[in-house]
């Protein structure tokens, strides 16, 4: 879905995704 408001949603999704990646890395280590 390409909408003007998607910019903020995408930013939040990226931040959330980064945190998830961090948790996975921490779990592996």
From Swiss-Prot:
Keywords (A to Z) from UniProt: Chloride, Chloride channel, Ion channel, Ion transport, Membrane, Phosphoprotein, Transmembrane, Transport
Post-translational modification: Phosphorylated by protein kinase C.
GO MF entries: chloride channel activity
Domain of life (superkingdom): Eukaryota
Subcellular location: Membrane
The keyword Membrane is assigned to this record: yes
Topological relation to the membrane, as annotated: Single-pass type I membrane protein
Cellular-component GO terms for this entry: chloride channel complex
Functional description taken from the UniProt entry: Induces a hyperpolarization-activated chloride current when expressed in Xenopus oocytes.
The family this protein is said to belong to: Belongs to the FXYD family.
Protein name: Phospholemman-like protein
Organism the protein comes from: Scyliorhinus canicula (Small-spotted catshark)
């Amino acid at each position: 879905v390409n909408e003007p408001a998607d910019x903020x949603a995408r930013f939040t999704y990226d931040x959330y995704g980064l945190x998830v990646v961090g948790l996975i890395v921490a779990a592996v280590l």
